[in-house]
């Protein structure tokens, strides 16, 4: 287990998404690919479409997809593997 915990809530309520103002967050899109990533800031994202696996350095792979509200902590180093084209709203804290 790594010291950086990825948190995920599957299919949060529409009320929660409204309170977070997810619809006003920028959108990120990416085609099928694999790449290393380091989070300099905490990122919260809501997946609109697609499927991907994130493997933290020294940790176990986790799969995410449509309807997931995910928080990636600042300092996390990982590898992204996009299995189906991804579209997500995101916010950096």
Predicted regions and their residues:
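Short acidic-glycine-tyrosine-enriched beta hairpin
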Residues: 58-74
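Ligand-binding loop in jelly-roll beta-barrel domains
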Residues: 74-93
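Double-stranded beta-helix
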Residues: 2-8, 24-27, 87-93
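Conserved short histidine dyad/triad with adjacent acidic residue
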Residues: 11, 21-40, 73-74
């Amino acid at each position: 287990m790594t010291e950086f915990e990825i948190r995920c809530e599957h299919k949060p309520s529409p009320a929660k998404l409204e309170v977070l103002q997810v619809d006003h967050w920028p959108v990120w899109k990416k085609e099928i690919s694999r790449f290393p990533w380091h989070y300099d800031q905490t990122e919260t994202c809501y997946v609109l479409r697609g499927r991907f696996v994130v493997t933290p350095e020294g940790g176990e792979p986790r799969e995410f997809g449509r309807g997931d509200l995910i928080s990636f902590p600042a300092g996390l180093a990982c590898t992204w593997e996009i299995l189906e084209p991804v579209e997500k709203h995101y916010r950096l804290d």
